[in-house]
């Protein structure tokens, strides 16, 4: 309908030990409860027919998983917004200066609306505070670094390869993702970033850092997961350690098979107690809605 590239390619979730094998069964049950069909638990002989280079004790096959070009999704949504009527606009590179219940002042003019919906991502908490919303949470940025498989190594991955999530940690773990266009990404890690939009390892912003480190939830997260966090930082600066993590599922992968890729920032919503808020938090404040 919208001519956006996508592919339902399927995914395997790989258990590498007995403990993960038990969680894999629970994962399958959760998927079936949520309406997924065709889920299968596969032994090594079976899952190697799908991903010959993967090693593990068991895998969950998720045939309905797929990939899509998210940039094209965003562009198509923008087109649809613009086509609603002559007053519909998509305005980019625009800073919010101030606002009240019906008026929002920005770097590109003042706009009036009966309702304002804020989806500010990394800055959603600051926008909410500007709107006099009292929060018991804060956004803390975590950078995820990726590597990519070289052209010669792409044949090692056919579809999507994921680890079994560890419920003790608020991060998924490194995985192999085939992208629309042919690239295969490996990662990410998860490291605290000293700038909310800090896509580089050396990025720093004093305001962002002070706000994050003066928040009780940040320190409680650090204390609860200090060992995990330390290992993530080591991997951020060591290609060989990053590779070692990938080799847990694909031992045949070599250091020359991976090259540095892109980075992304996760806008992690943390409660005052240091617990990660896993779902969207939607707050209504008079006529405004904050996500």
Residue ranges and their predicted role:
Residues 213, 219-291:
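C-terminal catalytic lobe of FAD-dependent flavoproteins
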């Amino acid at each position: 309908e919208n001519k956006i590239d996508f592919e339902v390619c399927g995914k395997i979730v790989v258990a590498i030990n007995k403990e993960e094998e038990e969680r894999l069964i629970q994962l399958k049950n959760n998927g079936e409860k949520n309406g997924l069909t065709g889920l299968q638990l596969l032994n090594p002989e079976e899952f190697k027919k799908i991903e010959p280079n993967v090693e593990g004790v068991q895998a969950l096959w998720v045939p309905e998983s797929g990939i899509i070009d998210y940039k094209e999704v965003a562009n198509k949504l923008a087109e649809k917004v613009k086509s609603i009527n002559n007053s519909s606009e998509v305005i980019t590179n625009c800073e919010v200066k101030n606002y009240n219940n019906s008026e929002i002042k920005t770097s590109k003019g003042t706009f009036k609306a009966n309702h304002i919906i804020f989806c500010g991502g990394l800055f959603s908490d600051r926008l909410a505070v500007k709107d006099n919303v009292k929060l018991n949470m804060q956004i803390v940025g975590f950078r995820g670094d990726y590597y990519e498989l070289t052209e010669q190594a792409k044949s090692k991955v056919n579809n999507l390869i994921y680890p079994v999530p560890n419920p003790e940690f608020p991060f998924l773990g490194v995985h192999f993702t085939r992208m629309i266009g042919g690239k295969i990404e490996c990662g990410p890690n998860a490291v605290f970033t000293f700038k909310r939009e800090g896509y580089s390892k050396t990025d720093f912003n004093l305001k962002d850092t002070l706000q994050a480190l003066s928040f009780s939830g940040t320190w409680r997260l650090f204390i609860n997961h200090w060992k995990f966090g330390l290992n993530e930082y080591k991997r951020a600066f060591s290609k060989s350690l990053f590779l070692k993590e990938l080799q847990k599922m694909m031992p045949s992968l070599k250091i020359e098979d991976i090259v540095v890729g892109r980075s992304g920032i996760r806008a992690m919503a943390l409660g005052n107690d240091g617990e990660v808020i896993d779902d969207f938090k939607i707050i209504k404040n008079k006529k405004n809605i904050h996500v």
